[in-house]
Amino acid sequence: MFEEPEWVEAAPAIVGLGAATAQVRPATAPPVKGRKRRHLLATLRALEAASLSQQTPSLPGSDSEEEEEVGRKKRHLQRPSLASVSKEVGKKRKGKCQKQAPSISDSEGKEIRRKCHRQAPPLGGVSAGEEKGKRKCQEYSSLHLTQPLDSVDQTVHNSRTSTATIDPSKPSPESMSPNSSHTLSRKQWRNRQKNKRRHKNKFRPLQTPEQAPPKASIEETEVPPVPKSDSQESRAGALRARMTQRLDGARFRYLNEQLYSGPSSAARRLFQEDPEAFLLYHRGFQRQVKKWPLHPVDRIAKDLRQKPASLVVADFGCGDCRLASSVRNPVHCFDLASLDPRVTVCDMAQVPLEDESVDVAVFCLSLMGTNIRDFLEEANRVLKTGGLLKVAEVSSRFEDIRTFLGAVTKLGFKIIYKDLTNSHFFLFDFEKTGPPRVGPKAQLSGLKLQPCLYKRR
């Protein structure tokens, strides 16, 4: 006679839907976001609370009376949890949310309730067909409702877990573990296993130093590291070597300046007072010449090897007797200090040789000092007429090569060969024509060469 209100039939359907979906979905659902979703949630909870207070009639689409009785028992068990949830959430927003409840047509609502009640699970478990029906029901309801019922499922599940601690007669989710494994899809199960492997060691307790595996035995077998003292000593040794090299370089530059800025007699006295100074100077000199593309002594030795081995050679400023070791000729070696037993220590302006006793006189990078004229006159004295004078000198020392050659010819020589192609030194060959043509008081400005000074690097 009187039509029952719409919410009487809609409430049990929604309750059944919540019960069905609560067992399918996992326990952890994403939180409800948005104002409209919160309004819909509050409306649904209010409808559930109102429906539980009345006697729900049996639907005409049920299979048997036993299923109706099982549904009543299940709703009776869920009554305190749903009531508590509705009291907590629905009191503040009940009136406001009822105004914004979504409208569903009568035909759509009846069809949803019919499908959900037909697929209500028994208490014993959930079969595969019933599970399939639940999924269809969820998909159909999600198409017509603006808000999915994830939040409802989460609240129902939380209320069940809270009542499960109070009511021991209700089976816990852990006791339904055999059936819960079937509710996961293959992709969900795979993701769960992956997360387990990923977080395997995340919550493992930290090991105390006593529980840590012993490493002392491994370290004892290894080679002990180099002590700090040795490394410090090696650094100190390297520093000392660097400082010694710098000091040697500074002293070499000082000695080189003294040799070029004074007469040969002063240089001889210097090396007589400090014999180690000549060794230091010679090491520095060899270090500088080693960087040259060609050593001038090697070039002179190559020229002498093409001449007869019977020619007597006088090497003025021989150093370490490199020329005497490179040729077969008899060589008289003269220098300010001795680095070899074959060296005769003397002033190159006064060598202990007879007049016209040698065939070749060599000045290889040895025209040092301010008395170069004395060296060349001494070479003219000991050379035979027609003898060969070979001069090799640093190219940067010559300001005007023509004036230098003119001054040498006035001392009784004539130029027969010159090589200006080398970037580091010039090579000249002179032949003795006779005694000097100028007196000892004559000025020969062309014989003045620039001092070869080394810059600090």
UniProtKB/Swiss-Prot annotation:
Pfam families: Methyltransf_8. Residues 129-138 have a biased composition (Basic and acidic residues). The keyword Transcription regulation applies. GO terms for cellular component: chromatin silencing complex; cytosol; eNoSc complex; nucleolus; nucleoplasm; plasma membrane; rDNA heterochromatin. The modification Phosphoserine is found at residues 62, 64, 105, 172, 177. Residues 51-61, 139-183 have a biased composition (Polar residues). Its main location: nucleus. It is found in: Nucleus, Nucleolus. Its EC number is 2.1.1.-. The keyword Repressor applies. S-adenosyl-L-methionine binds at residues 282, 317, 335, 347-348, 364. InterPro entries: RRP8 (IPR007823), RRP8_N (IPR042036), SAM-dependent_MTases_sf (IPR029063). Residues 47-237 are annotated as: Disordered. Keywords: Chromatin regulator, Methyltransferase, Nucleus, Phosphoprotein, Repressor, rRNA processing, S-adenosyl-L-methionine, Transcription, Transcription regulation, Transferase. Belongs to the methyltransferase superfamily. RRP8 family. PANTHER family: RIBOSOMAL RNA-PROCESSING PROTEIN 8 (PTHR12787:SF0). Component of the eNoSC complex, composed of SIRT1, SUV39H1 and RRP8. Essential component of the eNoSC (energy-dependent nucleolar silencing) complex, a complex that mediates silencing of rDNA in response to intracellular energy status and acts by recruiting histone-modifying enzymes. The eNoSC complex is able to sense the energy status of cell: upon glucose starvation, elevation of NAD(+)/NADP(+) ratio activates SIRT1, leading to histone H3 deacetylation followed by dimethylation of H3 at 'Lys-9' (H3K9me2) by SUV39H1 and the formation of silent chromatin in the rDNA locus. In the complex, RRP8 binds to H3K9me2 and probably acts as a methyltransferase. This is Ribosomal RNA-processing protein 8. The gene is Rrp8.
